[in-house]
Amino acid sequence: MVYSYTEKKRIRKDFGKRPQVLDVPYLLSIQLDSFQKFIEQDPEGQCGLEAAFRSVFPIQSYSGNSELQYVSYRLGEPVFDVQECQIRGVTYSAPLRVKLRLVIYEREAPEGTVKDIKEQEVYMGEIPLMTDNGTFVINGTERVIVSQLHRSPGVFFDSDKGKTHSSGKVLYNARIIPYRGSWLDFEFDPKDNLFVRIDRRRKLPATIILRALNYTTEQILDLFFEKVVFEIRDNKLQMELIPERLRGETASFDIEANGKVYVEKGRRITARHIRQLEKDDIKHIEVPVEYIAGKVVSKDYVDESTGELICAANMELSLDLLAKLSQSGHKRIETLFTNDLDHGPYISETVRVDPTNDRLSALVEIYRMMRPGEPPTREAAESLFENLFFSEDRYDLSAVGRMKFNRSLLRDEIEGSGILSKDDIIDVMKKLIDIRNGKGEVDDIDHLGNRRIRSVGEMAENQFRVGLVRVERAVKERLSLGDLDTLMPQDMINAKPISAAVKEFFGSSQLSQFMDQNNPLSEITHKRRISALGPGGLTRERAGFEVRDVHPTHYGRVCPIETPEGPNIGLINSLSVYAQTNEYGFLETPYRRVVDGVVTDEIHYLSAIEEGNYVIAQANSNLDDEGHFVEDLVTCRSKGESSLFSRDQVDYMDVSTQQVVSVGASLIPFLEHDDANRALMGANMQRQAVPTLRADKPLVGTGMERAVAVDSGVTAVAKRGGTVQYVDASRIVIKVNEDEMYPGEAGIDIYNLTKYTRSNQNTCINQMPCVSLGEPVERGDVLADGPSTDLGELALGQNMRVAFMPWNGYNFEDSILVSERVVQEDRFTTIHIQELACVSRDTKLGPEEITADIPNVGEAALSKLDESGIVYIGAEVTGGDILVGKVTPKGETQLTPEEKLLRAIFGEKASDVKDSSLRVPNGVSGTVIDVQVFTRDGVEKDKRALEIEEMQLKQAKKDLSEELQILEAGLFSRIRAVLVSGGVEAEKLDKLPRDRWLELGLTDEEKQNQLEQLAEQYDELKHEFEKKLEAKRRKITKGDDLAPGVLKIVKVYLAVKRRIQPGDKMAGRHGNKGVISKINPIEDMPYDENGTPVDIVLNPLGVPSRMNIGQILETHLGMAAKGIGDKINAMLKQQQEVAKLREFIQRAYDLGADVRQKVDLSTFSDDEVLRLAENLRKGMPIATPVFDGAKEAEIKELLKLGDLPTSGQITLFDGRTGEQFERPVTVGYMYMLKLNHLVDDKMHARSTGSYSLVTQQPLGGKAQFGGQRFGEMEVWALEAYGAAYTLQEMLTVKSDDVNGRTKMYKNIVDGNHQMEPGMPESFNVLLKEIRSLGINIELEDE
């Protein structure tokens, strides 16, 4: 493999055996591509804003005399960039401007004569923009729009599986689901009549809808039934014979023709009989007259002489009717062909229960069902029915819906109209009847071919369309109302409804979620999440077991492991690593094409529907060097089942072993050795890991770490290759390579790093450079690490030396014993940043004021505030300290005589304001790291605000001028090159000031042109600098746009350093979680023969029952990796020659490595080898990909290479006594995470506090400063111990005995430790409730 200079710093040894045919795709593309489709100009008008505009415009007036047409749209530039939006608490959005054309037609002139055209650009509100990382900044917070998995539009055939009716009869139904519009359901009832429902309302006989479509009874029967023709010849009844129809029936009479008996009476008719009848070409047979009785006629029969109706279509024939028909000259009678087997009489039966008999009555019936209580008129009924399924404004199947609809009905074309046609409705009914007749299957609703993904772009477009439709109504009114000659398009459009619809979606939709920003993995996973909940989706309560379960079609599309535990299990899923959506929104996954038994590198993406037609081999099938399968029988999947196929039957092969799982699960090494339940916990807990102070790469990884770190966007990645020209903590400057420059630019890339910013979860976001001056970098190299990344790899936790052994009960029930060394070395120390805001409002009694002059507060409390009343940066504060002094005016109150006296003596006037300062919440302490002051436009800024403003201006100017200097330097080096090549002497040139270089003239015309071009660039650069500086200055000095009634907002940022302590939750990556029970002194920890103590002691009993053996393998492999690191470290300390070092490292990389993925150190320079060795000192990082990991033998080999016992167990000694433990203990390195469930956030105690209003019991929970619930079972415990007085105290004075509480307080103050329990308030509530039932209950005094 070829490595860039940066990648050579540390190479992960890969145990993967399968070649990487397809690189891991960009992990956020599902979000970015979808939103890109929404906002980019689409000339076809298929999707995005363009489609929304075209679907609503042109808007015509009611009279048709004028219309408003849509021409085009453009998105402006956002006012603030992403960081400014986050600081100011505003939405990162761009203004949408739409060019509209108002066309007014002449009234009297012929149609289409234009009187006037007015074109104008109209502002239509703001559209939130997506940041580069796939998030939205809404009101200053980062949010993610989660993709939704919903039922695809189309037609679905289903059954109730016999659950509806008591008899257990299976009832079939069909449902036509449009993208928008009314649902149409057809269903059978237990009597086998077919009914229809519209929008799940009450059911009507299905033939009503056919009558509404203008079909007569005859036509309806003609559509759904084959005919049996009887002829009366010579007073005998003959039947036209189609032999195939007789199969399986029992003959009720001798079937004979031409004197030959084919089937005797009472015999079952078999295929042999039918073959004979066909062979002899029998067309008619004579039947007894009784045979026709009970048959149903297919059309009306009229006596032609009198015009009298003898029998109507769908009537049952009787012998009397037959006689009548014969008399009136009808010799040929057509009846419906039905049987019990596969031609049921369902429609014929349904026509009988249908109360309507013509189109009008059917329309009226539908109108009554849809609008009960309204009197139907013909016009209203017709327009209602027309609008239900046949109007493009009200009904749309969408391209997906039409495709699914036509495929389901086995039609050839997959495109068509978005509305229903007569044929559509009839074909659905026909297919439903076929299924009832036993032909065809019902659909599997959980098949991923029937569920599609709706991503950000599509949902935003739908919301936008909703807004436009609201505007459309208003525009129609305006066009009809008034004087069109003076009106312009912008007078017609009110942007409010559009803004409101978009704002509502991004701000408060169920699928617009507060981004989970614990660490880079949680960000990526959140953006790749797929939810079945949300508008138009399922609800938790209604979702059954089937929907939540893993389905065979999830393979390679949706992860079978990563899903929440709890009520949402299976409803919220995660996208698999390689999955993507196709044009219709269905998930597809890549496969390698197999041609004639040879696996090629050609890649096809298949959706769940297409996949069903192929045989697909697993990724771990063994291939030879030409790509042939080694085994004759290959394990494959076909139609959702796994079985063995011969190698020439195989069509496709999986791309990668990690194709099945999601990003989160693909980060668990040895996942294949973990039980699925624990793997689920492991994948979920990685997302809760808090970024530690110093990130530490996992010794045992899976090779996915780099992809996650880079794609998450927390690292700074080089856009173009070049050389590092300048680097400090907050900025990296790259001089771009010549071949990657755009013509006529300075060739300098500047990366500003994020420093100590707060994330959504209050963790700390901080970027640190990982390149040094003069290093070459290539495009895609990581320049700076973000939170939880180490040299461009995801690093969620720390590598800890663990031992599996019991230790004095301190690891009972998954508790974890931790060494003090872990605390000393700050291995799990995390920084948390909290934002506290103080808002100064304009109240009825006057404005609130931010000031240091606060009534009744001592000097000590004000010591950390400046003269404006705002805390200093760098101040260390604890719970209760004032951060921002604020006073609120209060109304004049009646003064007590004492207060009057005091005021008379001291002239104190401060009592008309009350203290409403911002204080540090209880239990929080930390350091103030930043203060932001926002002042409303037109309100005078205080001193602190001006200081901050001045500081920001200085910083902005410094940043920009440094940027200018860097760019100037780059430009002048190019000017110098031109001048020198044009004949100017270098020495003389260097003596001349740089500004004068551009005054020189060159004789070579081409060089002179180049020089003039560069001079122009220089002027442009300076002009650009002035412009940028001015813009920055305007932004900084401009007042802020605050909510109505708010004068000022002060935001204070507190940084808290949290060390690990008992009560914190930790976990490995295999679902092995626990709580720290004790921090043990280093000298008491078990140690090995070299005197090295372990860091963590885990309980061995946590492994067997949970079946997550991956943790043990990880521990062994981690030990081997560390052992190799130790040997490299020893070699470096002894300063052995590079050749030896190179040879040893090469041996380690070659061990168990596949030929295709060899690391060749011979291409590395000595310096590069030394630097690699330096980075391998703490252990050689290892990748063991999911389902393709290290084998047991390979781990043993690696342990041997690191001079460690191959059992992975060593002898330990007790740190307290020095005695040897009685058997060897498994010791190794496991990657441990500290989860965001910290004891500091959960610890809580209360003496007195707030009480609930009705029951007068203390509130619950830390947020309400509540008490501990002493529940039913606790009461039983005290009863069992006979602790009556304690129990009385718990139920009265410590809970809801109001008088007793007050008395007790007084007694304690007086030093009298007595209590007088009274009546608990909740008993009084009970009395009141009983009285409200009309039962008078009184307490009698003894």
From Swiss-Prot:
Entry superkingdom: Bacteria
Enzyme Commission number: 2.7.7.6
CC annotations in GO: DNA-directed RNA polymerase complex
One Pfam family cited in the UniProt record for this chain: RNA_pol_Rpb2_3
Reaction catalyzed: RNA(n) + a ribonucleoside 5'-triphosphate = RNA(n+1) + diphosphate
Entry keyword Coiled coil: no
UniProt-listed GO biological process terms: DNA-templated transcription
InterPro entries named in the record: DNA-dir_RNA_pol_bsu_ext_1_sf, DNA-dir_RNA_pol_bsu_external_1, DNA-dir_RNA_pol_su2, DNA-dir_RNAP_su2_dom, DNA-dir_RNAP_su2_hyb_sf, RNA_pol_bsu_bac, RNA_pol_bsu_CS, RNA_pol_bsu_protrusion
Keywords: DNA-directed RNA polymerase, Nucleotidyltransferase, Transcription, Transferase
GO terms for MF: DNA binding; DNA-directed RNA polymerase activity; ribonucleoside binding
PANTHER family: DNA-DIRECTED RNA POLYMERASE I SUBUNIT 2
Subunit relationships: The RNAP catalytic core consists of 2 alpha, 1 beta, 1 beta' and 1 omega subunit. When a sigma factor is associated with the core the holoenzyme is formed, which can initiate transcription.
Annotated family: Belongs to the RNA polymerase beta chain family.
Function: DNA-dependent RNA polymerase catalyzes the transcription of DNA into RNA using the four ribonucleoside triphosphates as substrates.
Name of this chain's protein: DNA-directed RNA polymerase subunit beta
Organism: Salmonella gallinarum (strain 287/91 / NCTC 13346)
Gene symbol of the encoding locus: rpoB
